[in-house]
Design a protein with these regions (language model features):
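Fold-independent oxyanion-binding glycine-rich loops
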Residues: 17-18, 58, 125, 146-148, ...
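RNA substrate-binding interface of SAM-dependent RNA methyltransferases
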Residues: 39, 45-144
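Generic structural signal for residues in well-ordered beta-strands
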Residues: 12, 36, 119-123, 192
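Active-site/ligand-binding-proximal alpha/beta "capping" segment
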Residues: 137-138, 142-182, 190-194
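N-terminal positively charged helical leader segments and presequences
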Residues: 1-43, 94
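Short acidic/polar active-site loop segments enriched in Thr and Asp
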Residues: 7, 77, 191
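Structured adenosyl-cofactor binding patch, chiefly the S-adenosyl-L-methionine
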Residues: 179-219
Length: 219
């Protein structure tokens, strides 16, 4: 409110992260709270036609914050942070919970910024091996981002497939997934996907794939 320099009688848009949004008028403003008059509900839907879930090996430092923010803006349906063999970032149970709350807050702010009114969940970090045993069997199209030269190029996948159901994208941390982790993913129904000959950062690769899939769905 302060950043936008809003005043009483100004109109704002409210959303609850689930079902549309509401027009509202500011009645009064305090240091820590705002009173509003909630008015008309608008059943506006801004989700992408394709549901893309991200399972990402967490990059270190603030790069994960940036990944969450941009993934939400690009339309990720959910984000699952993963601890892989080559992960630099290691979290205790207590710190993992605090990080989850922090990342969910970033997701809320990203929704506010881009006008998205459905809030995607950012799940608690979990070991990759646990995720591979648990992954959503209802997601039929599962891809793991790979540096293997035999991997299918994303461009070919986009041209050859109709994406009607949800998609799950798995990517590694700095250094990528280990050979054993990638082999385990392929054994559980993932297909290896290439983003080209260059080595992308851990936070760049899933966002590039997400953006390409989302644009294809909108077209």
């Amino acid at each position: 409110m302060q950043v936008l320099r809003l005043q009483p009688e100004d109109t704002i848009t409210l959303f609850n992260g689930r079902n549309g949004e509401w027009a509202a008028t500011i009645l009064r403003m305090g240091r820590a709270n705002v009173a509003v008059r909630v008015e008309q509900h608008h059943a506006i839907e801004r989700e992408a036609p394709l549901e893309v879930h991200l399972a990402v090996g967490m990059p270190a430092n603030e790069r994960m914050d940036w990944l969450v923010e941009k993934a939400v803006e690009l339309g990720a349906a959910s984000i699952q942070p993963l601890l892989a063999e080559r992960s630099v970032l290691r979290l205790s149970a207590d710190r993992a919970l605090k990080k989850q709350m922090h990342w969910q807050g970033i997701a809320i702010a990203a929704c506010e910024q881009c006008g998205r009114n459905r809030l995607p969940p950012v799940h608690a970090a979990r070991p990759l091996q646990d995720f591979q045993a648990w992954h959503q069997s209802s997601v039929q199209r599962r891809f793991v981002l790979s540096l293997d030269t035999d991997s299918q190029p994303l461009s070919r996948v986009l041209m050859s497939q109709e994406f009607e159901g949800p998609v799950l994208l798995l990517s590694g941390p700095e250094g990528g997934l280990s050979p054993a982790e990638e082999k385990a993913a392929l054994a559980t129904g993932f297909h290896a996907l290439s983003l080209g000959p260059r080595t992308l950062r851990a936070e760049t690769a899933p966002l590039a794939a997400l953006a390409a899939l989302t644009l294809q769905a909108f077209n």
